[in-house]
C-alpha cells in the first residue's frame, strides 16, 4: 500500500493471512521509515525507526501504545540505531521488562588505523537496555572483544550474531573461534567453537 508499511502475519496451518497491520507514514501512529519489527504478540509489536533513536510499541490495530527514546543513556552517551530488520542473527530480546538491543561499535570509540587495515577502538558496549517501565537507557558492561590481532591485515568488521535461549545470550563474532556466553552482560564465559570441517587461514581476509 503506497504511503504505508504493512506487517503481515500468516497462519502456518491454513496458509492464510491472519493479521495485517498498517503503519502510516504520516499522522499520530506513523513512522516515516521503519527499520524492522519484533512481535512479542499480535498486540505487542515493537517497530524501530530508521532515522530516529526510537522504538514504538503497536497493537494489532496499528495504534501506538508507547514509544521508547534511546538517543542517550543515563550518563548522556549517544547510542547507535537499534535495527530490528534481522530476526535470525540479531533478534530483539525482552527480558524482565527490559528491551535488549544490539549496539554497533561506537563511532566515538575508534582511535586509529595506522596501516589502513587494523582498526583500533576503545571499549565499546555490545548492547543497550531500555527499561519499558522507567524508560531508562543503559549500556551493557559487556563490550566488544579485541576482535583482531595487530599486523594481521584483517579489515575492520563488527559482524556479530546473537541468540537467546531463555536464560543466556550467546554471541558469535566474525573471524573468532569462541562463543561468548553471558546471562547478565557483566560476566562472560568463552566456549571454543572451531569448525571440525574447515581450517580457514584468516590472514589476508579481504576487506
Predicted regions and their residues:
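Short loop/turn segments that connect beta-strands within beta-propeller blades
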Residues: 12-14, 59-63, 131-135, 183-186
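Beta-propeller fold detector
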Residues: 17-24, 65-78, 137-145, 188-204
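Structural signature of eukaryotic scaffold interfaces centered on beta-propeller domains
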Residues: 36-40, 88-96, 157-165, 207
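Blade-loop segments of beta-propeller domains
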Residues: 16-46, 50, 71-82
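Beta-propeller blade signature
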Residues: 7-10, 62, 116-133
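Short beta-strand elements that form the blades of beta-propeller/WD-repeat-like
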Residues: 1-3, 43-50, 97-108, 162-174, ...
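Short, conserved, GDST-rich strand-edge loop motifs in beta-rich repeat architectures
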Residues: 102-122
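Short glycine-/Asp-/Thr-/Trp-enriched loop segments that recur within the blades
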Residues: 26-32, 74-87, 148-155, 199-205
